[in-house]
């Protein structure tokens, strides 16, 4: 055999070997493709669930008598397994129990919840949370669902040129300029900006009502948080913008006590305090009057009053000393009494701080209810209210992602690049790390990051807050870093102070240091220090995964439970004021006062509260249930095939709660961004309104703990590629030079190229290998898993590649799936991680195998049993069936595939079949992308698939009596119930058709009074038609198949099935259909080349090759050039060459006596068949005395294969040509030469002969093997006709759509067509008796069944509507009869209706009667999604 060096043999499994034509070899093992779902839910169950539940505890009663503490959480195993939940329509869920301890603080008595009598578990049953299955889905009410990941804007700080604040009523306040947007996960959005033509920095924030956006100075906010003017100027080194901001505001000692409208309250308190101080004759009296005055009015003013009284007293003390020392010079007096002056200055600064806090609280409408509850502690203040609003995680949360973003934006190390520093950077030992006047480079930045992280640089300072700000005891972060840089790198004459956040902050709330650093960032922008953010950059977006969505939902439920517990504790405490308690995670509410224990009788003590009596868990249960049943991001899993299921779980949506609407026309949101590289696939997205809003993760992308999408790269040091791999976020990408994976490397992995193409900050350029920091892993990391399964995608137009990616997800699993001969190497990974394959959990040896289960003895001598799924219905009604691919005695390894699922072959994805295709026209049948197929594809079940429909019926308890499952239904023909057994249930194996009864059921009618003689006759003849009505389950319109299984679920079953109270029994009937390929079915390749089957041609009439091989499919060659998907042509030639080589190697292996094992690994065939095949081929070689493959005739091989049940579909070497790194032109030429295909003369094309005439076609034709798929859009689901059927109650027109047995809409333009042809009678019928002429259609139906002529003389409902509208305009409408009489239209209509109702011979269709009886008013006349194909057949 010829051995080319441009490929390697890649052993994928024992039965699969592929020729790998990739040029870039990598041992990198990508992440598990389901990791995004599984790891997220694991994090929720192991960490988040306990955090959220325990977060509301301990809770204390208002009087301090009771304390409810959290002691533990128990997560139990589900009571039913997955399959039982699926069969019974239950939820696969895990029960949650919490251990709570109620302590009576007066008596010391401790109570806990007693053991649950029903479950035998200790603790309080909180509820049940659906458990994720191993393949990343949830079973909810028997249906598999999953959570789609939502891409949202990340909390953090953003620098923008334009921003807006949304107000109520869809209003917005727009701002332009240099804006710093502080965007929290929960809390008030704030914008810091410098107005045009001014230098003072302002803050804009939306008030709590949402009606307006309030503006105030940044220094006002800093003062409100406890900074003085002097401290602010010191931090910012007297910057001009800060000075102007201080000058604009009125919060200074000069203005604070002036009699103005802004300071009215301060002035009044100051005047009152002065009066009280002067009136008091002694100190005790002064204190008493002071306390009385402070306690009056709002509790939040008490702190302000207290400070003003202190100020007045301190001022009087200084004035008294001044009077005593009036001979002393002022300067000396102040020097001698500096402490007194400092104390007074601190007091006045505290007053300013409290006044600023008060103004902001009132301006923003901050809720002060929680703060007022602290009046007993003397802690209530506006300072506390403001800090609670911004520094309490329950009210203001930036999340871990927000903290990460704050640090990335505000650290000094992120802002000094390419700036000249104006001060030395000194370490703690006073060594100069970087001298002044140095231009900061990348190397300097890395040094600064390291030393700053280790706290080794002497530029860290602490913000000094006023005592009033520290009294709140709320955790703060006050460290910042600062350094001066030159405003202009060249002139170096003026400096500006850069103030940054110090590293190490772990708080997930806003901090004073954050505000200080943000203020610096705003004015630094004037000197081009810092950079504006691109809001569409992926570094500014993050994913909300299942753990975050569930955490938020459970936090809501726990907040409601907390409120309920507080109310109960307040009542049990005997507290009359019923104060809402706030736990110690928000405001410390521990009351330091003693309350006497109330006298309780012995009877009352027995009825004392228990743990169960003060907690109500219904909120938890209802919110969790509501989340999994109705949340926008919970969707049915697409189980069309393994690729569809896997792609579903890796999908990203920008829509959903708080997301983007599909009607939003913004193209920037939908467009591909450079930061998507290796993170989000630029190809795979839906067509239509959702384009760009629904995306897919790239094939190697993961999600980090903060929700940012990260991509892997190899580390490069000094031009050498290391084995170390790092995952980088999109923002980290921008800081490094990242080369493409296609660079040339030597054996030591040193980059050989003098210049390499690399990316830096969104731009591509040439760089030296020593400048490169990272290198891509493999080229395919750019695209999603679906796109990476398309060979030669680099040769396809983007729009066609998009269609190819989407249509692979629509491929229907076939009964004989074959993996593609021309693959990309990702087929195994996709099938393995999809969750549909059977994967070994441990190393071991196979002990037992059959069609139902696999038993493996692991290395610990324990048996692992794997039950195989057999013919289970999927969400898309396809057949989910698993087949073992191991044998007894085989050694298997952990994570090895041991069983194939649907659309798999030997562990590889197998969505379709390798088909011999010719690009030629044939009698016009493949016009406009139509596809001509050979009858072989029908006869040999090449594209045959199995579909399973589930039909369910419930036997209910009704107010008139119980329903009954029976074979004896009234008014049902024997033909319709011929397949029922004695109990009235269809027999398994019966071939049923439309209208056949599957389960017989009767429902009692209401009380119907009958004469005694009628009841006697009913008893004698067994006539039940008057007492019960037929409500059987029948085969729906247009359906047929074979009954595969019947499941009966009763509430009295031994397995303990739990059914609703009014349900006696549920019966499920599964009908299987075997669908062969037929005219009208949709087929497609992997390159976006799709079409509808237009003709099935007999094998003998199909064009054939020179050796007599007939084509399987003929495609229109005009479908290639304009679509620019040339990848299909490369696949065509490569596939044909691989198939030809397979035929050669089939013989060569036997000639070389390499053994039958080579057949197994090369062709993936069964061991027994491989032995027989090897034996027969060996005998054939001996008989023919062959020395080389060409000595054996093709017909002899065909006969041998047919004897063993094989075909050429089973013989062919497999190729792996990864996307962007696969077989090139030279490789294809080499492999075609190896297959003895004439390239020089025929360019790989073939002479085709007409099967009808035997003559050769003019010109050479491209023929080869293409991987074709049968899509879910099948004609059996779409074709539909209606004779009689249901009508809409409102319009009296036929319903629309196949699902409602509706008709075909005849619209305005269709009417024009009939008018153009003059087809008056056809038009009359269509607009009257076939539409909404009730009387006319009944008469027509009557006439047809009696064989009379049809006369349509009724009045359509639409004409009646027209007359009513004309009457509404004040017009008189009359009808003129034959005898010239004028009748009012209303009278005429009534007469017509009376005639219609009196007609005894009117015969109604059964379906119409049923709709009227059951009063099922159908208003929706839209088509069902499955009734038409919404895609263009281009």
From Swiss-Prot:
Family stated for the protein in its record: Belongs to the RNA polymerase beta chain family.
InterPro entries (UniProt xref): DNA-dir_RNA_pol_bsu_ext_1_sf, DNA-dir_RNA_pol_bsu_external_1, DNA-dir_RNA_pol_su2, DNA-dir_RNAP_su2_dom, DNA-dir_RNAP_su2_hyb_sf, RNA_pol_bsu_bac, RNA_pol_bsu_CS, RNA_pol_bsu_protrusion
Protein name according to UniProt: DNA-directed RNA polymerase subunit beta
One of the record's GO cellular component terms: DNA-directed RNA polymerase complex
Any one of the GO BP annotations: DNA-templated transcription
CDD domains attached to this UniProt entry: RNA_pol_B_RPB2 (cd00653)
Sequence intervals crossing the membrane: none
Keywords recorded for this protein, A-Z: DNA-directed RNA polymerase, Nucleotidyltransferase, Transcription, Transferase
Protein species of origin: Ureaplasma urealyticum serovar 10 (strain ATCC 33699 / Western)
Annotated GO MF terms: DNA binding; DNA-directed RNA polymerase activity; ribonucleoside binding
Enzyme Commission (EC) number: 2.7.7.6
